[in-house]
């Protein structure tokens, strides 16, 4: 079977498929290159496309005649033609009779027809494919064809090896020479692999190496199998016999030695990107361990690995940085050996900036970059359509740069060609085809017509106008809202044809037109400007204690057209999501709630308002702060008698600056006083000088304060005691508090114990008379105030002093003060008492001052007593009343106000001191003049008819004189312009008045005032209107139940209550009657009625009548299932009729017994029964035929009478409710129209509704006695 081997050659220079589709993609133009990219939206038909190699011919090694195939494929429009070169010469396979050529659209394939390998050898060489059309020629990579014979097994002699245990040995494989790299397998005769280890391994040369031999290594079937993948063959060598003889002596350990490679140094050359293996196979006993290191740097962990029990160092995709020195070290207990590899890495050429195919417009300058790298550096050469471009053949418009780039100036259509850039060094060659396609294309606007652009105020507006053509079209813009558009400094015409408007506003709204100059091509666009999003109230910075709840609020407003704005919260630029498990973060409208804040919650919180057009944000901070930690390390220093220095170290302020420190002390001898504040210290101080009291035992503590509160107290300082000293001060507020005559009481404020300054503290009290006693002081000691001196006469002046004393001495000398002995009551009353009447409620009182000698104390003032009895001509005697008015000590006249007009007063005056009052002066009497009266006590009204109102009132409680009559004022309330009507009532005895001729459609305001000789008094006001004739109810609604119908309606405001009836009959056949029934009279003021006793599932007709006229009718269906007529059955049998008759007879007897029992044992008073509980609203109606109506007048005639109601259809046997003829029943409410429906009381009303209010005890109140059947149900009561 023939075997072939195909190899990919020149992979770095392989030119990828150069389809025009790549040209149609928008590529980033490189510097100096004015290329054209045809957009996908540009319409063009039948565009010619330069050829491009799509399938490169491949290098191949041929081992049989069937393997020779060369293939080349290319694209282009029109389809390209192909030709070949072999070793630089033209080669036409179609002219060779040993070749067969197959050419189809876009491909060229040739293969050999030879039958022998010798014939094929003439075709060895380097082949290049050329694909051409009218736009140029593309060149393929070079493909190398090699002819090689497949490897064959050589005849060999059988090999036998002998060695002693512990020695090393290598079994040779010697694979035959071939262009293919073999794979070596050492196996036994059963094709089982020889077990490899760090002692036994296969070298890169294929040999099997033993670092040291064991007797069990002896065998006669060590076979080397050589595998060639390309030809799919395996060659098996002759088996080798290995005999390991045991040593007569104990095997001696041997230090490591290199088996492969030999010597201490080797050199390797590798190409960039290839795989390299370094190998160290060693011998020794015991088996050495092998390690690797790089002597001149670090080994790459990603590209370098170890294999074959660390005997091989493998480089994958080797790079230039891997070049250097590598050392393998073999080591056992006997020593170590080394081998050093020097690795040199070179590179075949590779692209760093490959040329790119482009389209160009005539007249443009084209720069074709072609940059490659390699070791050694490659040489750059250019060809055009496969023809070399030398320096001598360059036109003036063509030039080469030092970097290898080709520049074409002012390109024309004739410059359209395919340029080949080739980079070569000793390791290989790479080639790239690049198209220079000079083309002219008609202009087109690619942006759609009628686009609408929406922006917000202040944004930069970008209007698109994408055009394409060759040469490049020139565009301009016009606007309906901005004249001379491009002259506006905010407007910028972009190089891509777009329009940029900076800082847009509502004035920029309108239609904008993009035009291609020199043509009639244009598109329109509309610009809409919306209000920008604004944050009205940004979140505020928060400073909170741990555990509190933080609330950030972000209020904003957006344009109504910007729907569904997104409020996004961030913490330190990271999005915040609402917590559902621990409720840490909660979004509440515009608010962010952070519960139970902790140190991890500190940071910058940002609210972002995001719409589809803009985004605004505002940030704030959350700082956790707490009470400060207590100060530490308290020390008392610099003790100087009564001054010490207290030092401390501040604690942590917990993010809230210290405001101040509070120094507190505790006296160890007076712990009952607790801790007291001694001094406050500024926050920047860490020590303070403290003034102390003598004779005290101090302990100090310090508390820090910030805006979060006070810290815990610090630890206590050491105890410090101050020595005793004489008092520094005397008691304060020394005074006399003498109350009893002939006694001097000296008192003062007791001194604080800390001011005692020493032991044995007491007070020295000193006193002497101010006049007549000489300079001598009386002295006495005491331990507490007061100090009492007797026998000193009444109200005498003394000088008094109190001095502090202790065991160490006296306090400072005190200043004397004046004190007095006890007072007594004044002896005389004021004289010359006078009264001046100023008006009906005010008088002026005058008097002469009393003699100071008679006061016998400090005069504090005068007391004026006023006594009044009753008004003149008052209707009842009033009890006497006394009023006292107090004046100052220096006053001799006083105005007294708020007296009662038209009243008799007695007046007297006395002087008083701290001991009491002196005698009263002689009384003087006076009478106050008349005043205007107060308002009448009450006023109410009734309305006898639609044009009359009667007012009733009571006289004023304070007439303040003789009533002369009343004045009534009234007017319509519809407008302030209505004239005020005045009625004068001459007699004070009149207490009611009827006004006639009033407008039934108007509301009135009534004002009533009483009159005396002093004038009219205050008024009482009432609002009201007349009462209209009664009308039947309106807006009736109903709801059906199974056995009843609930009816409700609206009572007519301002109208008198009326009675109406409800007539009903069942439409379900004769079983339910088919006969009209009616309720008794229903009161329209109830607004609710329940029609009971109906049959479930039945259809009823209802008529509502008033004054024998039907004012509303309807039909209803009760809920539930109707009862169907029972078909004749056993119930018609004679025996069943007899049983029923017996039961009926028994029930009749039982009913008679019940009546007998009630007549004997249930006696009651006829009078009590007549006056007993009765539905005050329910009165039975006389028997009337259908359509008749009972008048209200007849109802009034039967008021206060009772009648027996008819028994209901569902009466229960022996039920007291049914036997008691005066119990509640289904009767209609009777109205007492004499009750004052229009009666109004003197209180504010907003309209005519109060005229129809019903008192609780009124017969019109449904809560008084609710009907039991066919009336309002009990739940309304």
Swiss-Prot record:
Record SUPFAM superfamilies: Fibronectin type III, Immunoglobulin
For this chain, the annotated S-S bridges are 72-129, 173-224, 280-328, 370-421, 465-514, 554-607
Topological domains (Extracellular): residue ranges?
A: 35-1135
Q: Which InterPro entries match?
A: FN3_dom (IPR003961), FN3_sf (IPR036116), Ig-like_dom (IPR007110), Ig-like_dom_sf (IPR036179), Ig-like_fold (IPR013783), Ig_I-set (IPR013098), Ig_sub (IPR003599), Ig_sub2 (IPR003598)
Keywords recorded for this protein, A-Z: Cell adhesion, Cell membrane, Cell projection, Disulfide bond, Glycoprotein, Immunoglobulin domain, Membrane, Repeat, Signal, Transmembrane, Transmembrane helix
Subcellular locations according to the entry: Cell membrane; Cell projection, Growth cone
Any GO MF annotation of the entry: cell-cell adhesion mediator activity
Q: Where is this region: Disordered?
A: 714-740, 1163-1216, 1232-1277
UniProt keyword annotation of Cell membrane present: yes
* CDD domains to which the protein is assigned, alphabetical: FN3, Ig
SMART domains, from UniProt? FN3 (SM00060), IG (SM00409), IGc2 (SM00408)
Q: Which residues are glycosylated?
A: 317, 503, 520, 531, 794, 839, 1035, 1046, 1068, 1083, 1108
- Gene Ontology cellular-component annotations: axonal growth cone; plasma membrane
Q: Which Gene3D superfamilies match?
A: Immunoglobulins
Polar residues: compositionally biased ranges: 1232-1242
Spell out the Pfam families in the cross-references: Bravo_FIGEY (PF13882), fn3 (PF00041), I-set (PF07679), Ig_3 (PF13927)
Regions of biased composition (Low complexity) lie at 1255-1277
Q: Where is the Fibronectin type-III domain?
A: 630-725, 730-824, 829-931, 935-1030, 1032-1129
Q: Please, one GO biological process term?
A: brain development
Highest taxon, organism lineage: Eukaryota
Domain spans labelled Ig-like C2-type: 51-140, 150-241, 256-344, 349-437, 443-528, 532-623
Matching PROSITE patterns: FN3 (PS50853), IG_LIKE (PS50835)
Classification via PANTHER family:
L1 CELL ADHESION MOLECULE, PROTEIN SIDEKICK
Write the protein's name: Neural cell adhesion molecule L1
What organism does this protein naturally occur in?
Takifugu rubripes
